[in-house]
Amino acid sequence: MKLRPHLKIEAKGTGSVSFFSEDWLTAQQARTFARELGRFPYMKELEFEDEKGGSWTLKELEKLTEELAQEPDDITVYFDGSFDKESELAGLGIVIYYSLGGTRHRLRKNKSFRLKTNNEAEYAALYEAIREVRELGASRNSITIKGDSLVVLNQLDGSWPCYDPSHNEWLDKIEALLESLKLTPTYETIQRKDNQEADGLAKKILSHQFVESHTKLDRNGDDDIG
């Protein structure tokens, strides 16, 4: 979950002044920020706004942070789909990075389905990726979704209209799943060269190479095999 502070300061002879920050903080950062500001006598009011416009007091934020400490945070999803026209077999590549208990983790997985087009494969890859996020236990949080499919990401964020009935079905399924988990998505279109990890997984399963790994990462983002 991302939050930004709204605060009111009152000093002698000047009355109160309200401030609003445009910078987003994680729940943990917001709690630390609130504790530090709470030490100053001129602080009159402090609340935090979440990405959906909700307000949180420090007391509510303390409780939320304790609850979220047991759930994945700082979640980034990479997805990609490959499609073989002759067999109508779609390969789905999924990579999820997240934090839990102060440690970074990475989930890598591929799946295959019978579909009709490459765009459907891209939609299916993202849908299955969000299902994996659900299995990790994530909810009420922010999620960054990255892929190289302009069709999927631009239709999801509303930049492009969607006229294809099958695409609309996938859009509805993805949005319903995100809503049920209370996840707030940010969509980022990336270059294909920056999506090689998910792309490689999607292609491997078309060659019957199944991959499923769940790895703890070290501080440099590398596999922690020690």
Swiss-Prot record:
SUPFAM superfamilies in the cross-refs: Ribonuclease H-like
Pfam families, sorted: RVT_3
Cross-referenced PROSITE patterns: RNASE_H_1
GO MF terms, alphabetically ordered: nucleic acid binding; RNA-DNA hybrid ribonuclease activity
Residue ranges constituting the RNase H type-1 domain according to the UniProt record: 71-207
PANTHER family, A to Z: POLYNUCLEOTIDYL TRANSFERASE, RIBONUCLEASE H-LIKE SUPERFAMILY PROTEIN (PTHR46387), RIBONUCLEASE HI (PTHR46387:SF2)
Listed NCBIfam families: PRK07708.1 (NF005822)
Name of the protein this chain belongs to: Uncharacterized protein YpeP
Organism the protein comes from: Bacillus subtilis (strain 168)
